[in-house]
């Protein structure tokens, strides 16, 4: 079998395979045996008919079996020599007594071109600006939390705290029965459980209905047990002492908040930089993929979606009932997904980054917290579920790649407002 590359376009190669006379004879012999064992010819026992009779009676069947024989040989060679993104595609074939030729599309895994990490610019929010805002915000939260409550006889006003008994019914069923709740009547909260209470006094009963659609109407009955006026303590030494006995002065409280803020800042900035690193990697990498490959990927999934009428109509509606817009969205999805997958793999391969089984198992403690199960149960799941194991391994590999990029990239400090403005501008461009 001789292989000749006819054309090459990035990851796609069109190859012509030509078979020798001996291979043609072998293919015919195998094909005839297959057909002889399947067909019944009058006058002969099954599997005993002469090959020349089978050849003359079933020429197209024999030809089809020969093509399958050649196809299997080609696919085996491709599997051994290539890393495939798509199964091989038969483009053309020629089969005669003394000539056998097949033209095949081979779609390899695409490569990516990656910019030097030193060219990446990652943004880190200016720490002093963040800490100043964090301390101010935290002090105001503590001021609200430790407000002094003073019972009042008059009607409830905004910023008062109320204690109520709430009963909710629907369709004759009791959903909530006299549940005691305490909450603050904030002016910006327009829910009826707030707005309907303002102006009412202790001992009053408020009733109203809420329609949440789909024929579901809920009846609320709220008994007001207590109205309290909230007096905010000045942000001073008095507030510090109220928060905890370990603080004597406001400065001590501020120092404690700053230490807490520093720890949060470092964790959040670490994650923020790593997220930017991977985003920059994906955005700046060039995917070397043929349009023909993308077309094949899109049409394959498009046909699959179309077979599910409900799913197809839903997706079509999301894309202005335009099949071409849906195809374009699928294409963009594949481009982004492949850029991420293959750029991360390439960086990991070129920098000897890997994730061991022990490293995956060590994630069990974090997973246990996220999943709400024991650490031992999380470890058991990682051992028994290869799909989950591989998902965790992939996330850890992404983390290592991100850390490598952060080490080499240029990091610049920006003010929080600069970052907010950039985010608004990016959202505006995305909407347009």
From Swiss-Prot:
It catalyses: [protein]-peptidylproline (omega=180) = [protein]-peptidylproline (omega=0). One of its GO terms (cellular component) is cytoplasm. This is Trigger factor. InterPro entries: GreA/GreB_C_sf (IPR036953), Trig_fac (IPR005215), Trigger_fac_C (IPR008880), Trigger_fac_C_sf (IPR037041), Trigger_fac_ribosome-bd_bac (IPR008881), Trigger_fac_ribosome-bd_sf (IPR036611), Trigger_fact/SurA_dom_sf (IPR027304). Consists of 3 domains; the N-terminus binds the ribosome, the middle domain has PPIase activity, while the C-terminus has intrinsic chaperone activity on its own. Involved in protein export. Acts as a chaperone by maintaining the newly synthesized protein in an open conformation. Functions as a peptidyl-prolyl cis-trans isomerase. It comes from Pseudothermotoga lettingae (strain ATCC BAA-301 / DSM 14385 / NBRC 107922 / TMO) (Thermotoga lettingae). NCBIfam families: tig. Its EC number is 5.2.1.8.
